[in-house]
C-alpha cells in the first residue's frame, strides 16, 4: 500500500511549505512593486 504514507507527506507539504512559499513569493512581489 503506497497510499498509506501519502497523507503524512502531503499534510506538512501543504500545511507548512506551501504557505511559506506563497508568503515569500508575495514578499518578493511586494518588494519589486513600484506602483505605490
Swiss-Prot record:
Keywords: Chloroplast, Membrane, Photosynthesis, Photosystem I, Plastid, Thylakoid, Transmembrane, Transmembrane helix. It is found in: Plastid, Chloroplast thylakoid membrane. It holds the Pfam family PSI_8. GO terms for cellular component: chloroplast thylakoid membrane; photosystem I. Its main location: plastid. It comes from the Eukaryota. The chain crosses the membrane at residues 10-30. One of its GO terms (biological process) is photosynthesis. SUPFAM superfamilies: Subunit VIII of photosystem I reaction centre, PsaI. InterPro entries: PSI_PsaI, PSI_PsaI_sf. It is a single-pass membrane protein. Belongs to the PsaI family. May help in the organization of the PsaL subunit. This is Photosystem I reaction center subunit VIII. It comes from Skeletonema costatum.
